[in-house]
Amino acid sequence: MIPARLHRDYKGLVLLGILLGTLWETGCTQIRYSVPEELEKGSRVGDISRDLGLEPRELAERGVRIIPRGRTQLFALNPRSGSLVTAGRIDREELCMGAIKCQLNLDILMEDKVKIYGVEVEVRDINDNAPYFRESELEIKISENAATEMRFPLPHAWDPDIGKNSLQSYELSPNTHFSLIVQNGADGSKYPELVLKRALDREEKAAHHLVLTASDGGDPVRTGTARIRVMVLDANDNAPAFAQPEYRASVPENLALGTQLLVVNATDPDEGVNAEVRYSFRSVDDKAAQVFKLDCNSGTISTIGELDHEESGFYQMEVQAMDNAGYSARAKVLITVLDVNDNAPEVVLTSLASSVPENSPRGTLIALLNVNDQDSEENGQVICFIQGNLPFKLEKSYGNYYSLVTDIVLDREQVPSYNITVTATDRGTPPLSTETHISLNVADTNDNPPVFPQASYSAYIPENNPRGVSLVSVTAHDPDCEENAQITYSLAENTIQGASLSSYVSINSDTGVLYALSSFDYEQFRDLQVKVMARDNGHPPLSSNVSLSLFVLDQNDNAPEILYPALPTDGSTSVELAPRSAEPGYLVTKVVAVDRDSGQNAWLSYRLLKASEPGLFSVGLHTGEVRTARALLDRDALKQSLVVAVQDHGQPPLSATVTLTVAVANSIPQVLADLGSLESPANSETSDLTLYLVVAVAAVSCVFLAFVILLLALRLRRWHKSRLLQASGGGLTGAPASHFVGVDGVQAFLQTYSHEVSLTTDSRRSHLIFPQPNYADMLVSQESFEKSEPLLLSGDSVFSKDGHGLIEQAPPNTDWRFSQAQRPGTSGSQNGDDTGTWPNNQFDTEMLQAMILASASEAADGSSTLGGGAGTMGLSARYGPQFTLQHVPDYRQNVYIPGSNATLTNAAGKRDGKAPAGGNGNKKKSGKKEKK
């Protein structure tokens, strides 16, 4: 029989082991530790990392943490050591009052695997509490006729500890009338009773004082005492008795305060005062004493506190009935608190992700919920669901845990955020529910490239635009957000006519506005093909391109260019021949012009602007052909000048002119013969003008000479006064001689005779041009001359076209150096080398003026050419203290003799460093000579 029972027990153990192994594999892992109570904070409970199969450093990496329960956390994880430690005071009596075994349960969550481990911590009792009596002093009344061996119940002691640390024994102080016995209750409690061993005699002793000591079994032993005063009363030999030894009641937890639960009743066979009974609680714990009240006269038990099934579902109390003689009786009261569905489910978010990437796969964990209901049975059974049609679902996890996961792949561009409502409902009547709201943001990922609203763009810009002007704005849209939607614009690299595209246009990387970096020229290129790229700032970045066409619009910025007749480069003028026998409409020549513009800006029209003989020639409006308008007559001049204007049709119109010289003759030799016959009349016509010029020059010279004489007289007077001062004050120190020589006379001379005569073949009269006077206070030194600008520029040294430098001057001709006989002075008797200095006394100045006037007179008659003979010299504005005539440039080239074709040349016949030419080749055009 016994082996069969052992076989069945062994089989049950095997099945239990298999079941426990299965639960372990499914995640319901239980870890057990045992610790004594009252440990210091931070004391080690167990090596949780080892029991989880992890290294201590992996606790933080895997998100291992304790799921909190309640407000007070008793344990914590030490991430360094991987141990479970105490986080506060652990008092077994406070946590597990009266329980034989005190176990604390906690849950540990491993977030990376979403796995929960259960941990049981057994709190071992220590002897930290001494036995105590609720009443330290007790008074017992005993009738004097009480029989021996009569027992009187005494208050029992309380010890919160358990086992051997709990209450073990009672001891009564030595006396002659009483002894102590201990009764063991059904629950293991010990109840002391006072036993009368010797009959009492009130007349012998009315009161007895005893000491009751309660001891536990701890090491060391702890004790508690109570003082007992025994009062001997007059005889009363009947004790009260309860109608039943035990009272039971079952009440719901939602009773109102003051509700009567039950009534206990005890009777005493005595009569009168000895039959009066009073009720009281004999044995009741602290929680029951706060909830229930016993009426001492009626025996009615009612509520004075709220009943809560979740806090305590059962109460056990002991009541006693005592008469006036001290006789008493005891009875038990058992009250069961029935559960009522008065607690709604509680939902605790143990793990919550505030956002989830939009490209997360299905089943991505959003939150971990712990659902609890403090009610029992059906009132504590909870179901959870999500309200609305949302792409999420709840999955049952370990115990009361639910996992909120995604049901589809989310798209932020469609729905950027969700408000999730999780409803937990119990099965009670009526059912109670709790709603938990979860706000979830869908994090953006860079899954959308920028998009241009148009497939291509076109823009038109007129040429000659200012630099920096905005051309066009392109804008792309990115449905992503934040950095993924921040767009940067750029231009694709390209070359235009060998130059980089970036030298023509640029784009604002933030706004997409295209700017012109240079002024566009329609004649250079007419369109630009640009590729604009929009790139976002996501990771990885996405981009898109769009084509942009820039069309340059033509402006009328180019004047017509005359191709024929071409402008001469050597100063000569082309001559067209028109035979005198030409009929009306005869084609003399054709003006050919082009315009670099396009459209109507390049439409050209020709017209005759000016003609020396009006009505003789006509110009084709659109062809530019110069034709005779009538027959040529003998009275028509040999030379005909035509000014033809070419104009485009732009707004505003631009034009160009060309001067044509038409010779009315049948051949070139006839042209030359006719020009020779016309020379004498021309000279006769200009003789009057030459006479007027000579008279004007003589008058100006006389005025200048008078001014010089007056100036010299004043300076001589000043010099004479200074000599007198020097003679009278010999102690005065003289100032050193200046390095600069005053040339007031020469200054006046340069001012007076700074003019030029221009004679052209186009005019019947010669023109005398007087430029603005050029003043100078003193002659500058040779060093300052080399650094400063020249006062007068001759034909040998002129500014270049761009104005940045000077054209090199032809070297001075040695034939222009003065010989000893030619050098100004007193009769030419002064000695010196060939590089004589500038005259520096009054006599030499007068001689210089006379020579200049003589030269002017010789030039006026037109019969001689100034050469290298005596009395000729060249002048220039560049001179200094050590100036010599060798440095004087050839000035004769700027002097034209009125009434003749002669110009000043040197002895070798050179002019401007070129070979001598005919008189007509050296003539200047009227109005074209500009004073530099």
From Swiss-Prot:
GO molecular function term, any single one: calcium ion binding
Q: Mind telling me which SUPFAM superfamilies this protein's record contains?
A: Cadherin-like
Family matches, as Pfam families:
Cadherin, Cadherin_2, Cadherin_C_2, Cadherin_tail
Highest taxon of source:
Eukaryota
- Chain ranges sitting on the Cytoplasmic side read 714-932
Q: Name one GO biological process term.
A: nervous system development
Q: Which UniProt keywords apply?
A: Calcium, Cell adhesion, Cell membrane, Glycoprotein, Membrane, Repeat, Signal, Transmembrane, Transmembrane helix
Name of the featured protein = Protocadherin gamma-A12
Species per Swiss-Prot/TrEMBL record: Pan troglodytes (Chimpanzee)
Tell me how this protein sits in the membrane.
Single-pass type I membrane protein
Q: Specify residue ranges for compositional bias: Polar residues.
A: 816-841
Q: What GO terms fall under cellular component here?
A: plasma membrane
